[in-house]
UniProtKB/Swiss-Prot annotation:
Subcellular location: Mitochondrion inner membrane
Protein name from the UniProt record: Mitochondrial inner membrane protein Mpv17
Known role: Non-selective channel that modulates the membrane potential under normal conditions and oxidative stress, and is involved in mitochondrial homeostasis. Involved in mitochondrial deoxynucleoside triphosphates (dNTP) pool homeostasis and mitochondrial DNA (mtDNA) maintenance. May be involved in the regulation of reactive oxygen species metabolism and the control of oxidative phosphorylation.
Database matches in InterPro entries: Mpv17_PMP22
Transmembrane segment boundaries: 18-38, 53-73, 94-114, 131-151
Disulfide bonds: none
GO biological process, one term: regulation of mitochondrial DNA metabolic process
Amino acid sequence: MALWRAYQRALTAHPWKVQVLTAGSLMGLGDVISQQLVERRGLQAHQAGRTLTMASLGCGFVGPVVGGWYRVLDRLIPGTTKVDALKKMLLDQGGFAPCFLGCFLPLVGTLNGLSAQDNWAKLQRDFPDALITNYYLWPAVQLANFYLVPLHYRLAVVQCVAVIWNSYLSWKAHRL
């Protein structure tokens, strides 16, 4: 409980920084889970640079983009009713999710040194499956998130659920 209270105080004092650092930390954790539990690399074969890249993407891309998106979404649909939550989820999943994945996957490919041609081929191969998999998890999570969770906690809630999603994304993005 003391850790949670400290997190809440930090979030109140420095909301943007804490949200971005939370996203980065949990993206890094997702990659560790991907490498150790999904890919079963073992500690000797663990690619620390890859984990650092994913954590950096969390801080430099995921945290700012998703955190900013939630602010925009709350301005576009300011209410907190069930209908408002449904509208937010539909806009999030119908508009934002495809755009986010369409940027995230090639960004990882670029950071991994893929050529533009290879990156495009990888995006065409991986995007449909990643988007379909997204729709198995995120609509229900986001509906609850938009209805039950205050704006300043949404990114943290999503990133906690996203540890598993990040493991999947890391595996998908690093699979050649």
